[in-house]
Amino acid sequence: MRDRFGFDESSVAGAPYWRKPQLGRRLFFRHLASAVGGYMLMPGQRPMETIARAAVTPKATAKYCIFFMLQSAPSHTDTFDLKPSNGFPAEQFKPTTYNGVLFPQGLMPKLAEQLDSLVLVRSARAWANVHGLMQTWVQIGRNPATPLAKISPHIGSVVSLELTNKSAVLPAFIALNGTPRAASGFLPVANAPFLLTGGAGLPNTAHRDGRERFAARTALLRESEAAGVPTAAELGALPDEIADWKLRSQLLMYNSQVDRIFQLDGDTRTQYGGTPLGDACLTARNLLRSNMGTRFIQITYGSWDHHNNLYPRLTAMAGEFDSALGRLLADLKADGLLDQTLIVAQGEFGRTVGPLNGAAGRDHYQQQSIVFAGARIKGGRAIGVTDERGARTVEPQWSRDRDVRPEDTEATIYSALGIDWTTLKRDARFGRGYEYLPTSEDVYSPVHELWG
């Protein structure tokens, strides 16, 4: 069935979301064997066991990941897959070609200067074009409309589970400038996103009655707990979990190193744009510089929902994004941290192609572009070629020879961070396995072409 652009979704390389890639016989029986074996082994096992189901080699080039959720979906053909035939304001956008990559230098001049660090994946496609559905899909790496999605953790929570250091002061997963669409799911709450809003810094790190009074009350609390706490056999692991939470909270309090992370210098704030997004990017830089335990940062920025008056609104949004990300890339590169950090920026889908709609805007559309940087990827290029309007992929230019889907992006993040994306976690509490990547290898996989 063709849409109003004359495009038949069923012809896309890779099936539409209601007919996702199917399991072959061999993979089906491999998973069946894992499931039966896991079920038989469950009695007497720890609450969560890890099953690696395929021999894969993660890239492991990154220590950190900064994920930009460009909420409500920017127009891909006016930003990272620029299409002159669609009629953007050329004098303002100043389209310029860098090593064969067409880029709107006038719209995003700072990113144009950093293009040698960027890879623009233009062969990406969303499964649907509904905001809430796809924002969640992108952040959990699977269909939110399935029963398992209700307990599915955010990608950042999986990273937290895998990479949290017991000596860390700060949470492994921090969310800036907006609330993620998912939390820790069935994973321990310690892996949930630690939400920070605005540029006011970390709240409640000093007691209102002073440090000495706080220390005295803490000591009194310890004595009270020691006198009346039930035994470990009665409470299981709960006392240890509570003690761990208290310890981590106390490490954040009266900590000058932590305070410095959230003290944003006025001149530097201006260089980042002096906006909430700029403050979030500056905070992300400070978190990475501190090396105090944070491994995954989500920065939310939107709304890009430009159904009307596209070009004035896009110019303002892209300008803020350019100032903040452009400066972040420059600072991380100067610090030697860019090679240790995978940066991913994407919306939940793209925007309609060709002429603007009757309100001078663009509506929801599944084709999109994703920006990658850092982690020693080979920058200054694009992966994937779309048709002259940007409506569909004509050359995927990666090993799967189809569109890049959200699950593939999830696998790419895991691979860069050294995480086996084929992992299955089996939790006795709900008696089933949870795949980091749905149906894993043989269906979805990392875009390793980013590394050349």
Task: Name every feature range the model reports, one short phrase each.
Residues 1-452:
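Ligand-binding pockets and gating/stacking loops
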